[in-house]
Design a protein with these regions (language model features):
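Charged, amphipathic alpha-helical linkers/stalks
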Residues: 2-91
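Ankyrin-repeat boundary/"N-cap" motif
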Residues: 18, 80-86, 102-128, 140, ...
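Ankyrin repeat structural motif
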Residues: 98, 132-140, 161-170, 177-181
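Ankyrin-repeat C-terminal turn/loop position
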Residues: 143-145, 173
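Repeat-mediated protein-protein interaction surfaces in helical alpha-solenoids
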Residues: 91-108, 135
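A generic signature of intrinsically disordered, low-complexity regions enriched in glycine/proline
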Residues: 37, 48, 64-66, 98, ...
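Generic surface-pattern signal
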Residues: 34, 41-45, 57, 86, ...
Length: 187
C-alpha cells in the first residue's frame, strides 16, 4: 500500500477501509497490479519537470534529466522486485510482463543498450538487491540469469555474500553442464 502512494500516485488505490477486508483484497491487488503495469510501461522521461537551480542555464537541466531517468528506472525495478517478492493474487500474465521487464533491462537484454538498471542495482553494495538471495531467486525465475550475466555479476559483485556467490556458482554450473568437453571423460 505504501508503494501505491509513494510512486504510483493513484488515489483510488489508497482505500484503507478496503485493504483490511479479505473480500476486497483480491480486487484491490488487481487494481494495484494494473496501475503498476501502467507505471512500468510509461516512458522513463514521463513527468519530468526541470527545476532551475541557477540562472536558468541549460546545464541545470542537462544534469537533472539523467538523474531523473535513473531514479525513475530504479523505482520501476524496485516495485517489480517488491511485487514478485510478495506475489499474492498476481496473475500469470502480469507476472510474465514484470519478469519480461527485468529480462529486457539486464545486460544482453533487448533494452540493454539504453541502460542496465537491474544489473546496476544488483551490483550496488549499498542496496539490499545485491545482498539478499531472494532477489537472485526472482531473477532466476524470470530467466535473467544466463552464463553471460552470471559471469558479469560474479565480476562486479566481488564482495557478495557467500550465499549469493554459492547460488550464482551453482546456477552457472547448471547452465554449463553438458557443454564441458571434459565431462565426456568422467566415469
Amino acid at each position: 500500500m505504501a508503494s501505491a502512494v509513494r510512486v504510483l500516485k493513484k488515489e483510488e488505490l489508497c482505500r484503507p477501509e478496503l485493504a483490511g477486508k479479505s473480500a476486497f483484497h483480491r480486487e484491490w491487488m488487481k487494481e494495484y497490479d494494473s496501475a503498476l503495469l501502467r507505471f512500468i510501461q510509461e516512458e522513463d522521461a514521463e513527468g519530468f519537470e526541470p527545476v532551475f537551480i541557477g540562472w536558468f542555464h541549460v546545464e541545470d537541466t542537462d544534469e537533472q534529466i539523467p538523474r531523473y531517468l535513473k531514479k525513475r528506472r530504479e523505482d520501476k525495478v524496485e516495485l517489480i522486485f517488491q511485487r514478485l517478492l510478495y506475489p499474492e493474487y498476481l496473475s500469470g500474465e502480469d507476472r510474465t510482463l514484470l519478469e519480461k521487464y527485468l529480462r529486457e533491462h539486464m545486460p544482453y537484454g533487448s533494452r540493454a543498450k539504453e541502460h542496465t538498471v537491474v544489473f546496476d542495482m544488483l551490483c550496488d553494495p549499498s542496496t539490499e538487491y545485491g545482498t539478499d538471495i531472494a532477489y537472485m531467486k526472482i531473477l532466476e525465475k524470470a530467466g535473467c540469469l544466463t552464463k553471460e550475466t552470471i559471469s558479469l555479476l560474479m565480476e562486479q559483485m566481488e564482495e557478495a555474500a557467500a550465499e549469493i556467490t554459492a547460488f550464482l556458482l551453482k546456477k552457472q554450473a547448471e547452465l554449463t553442464k553438458g557443454n564441458d568437453y571434459f565431462s565426456e571423460f568422467e566415469l
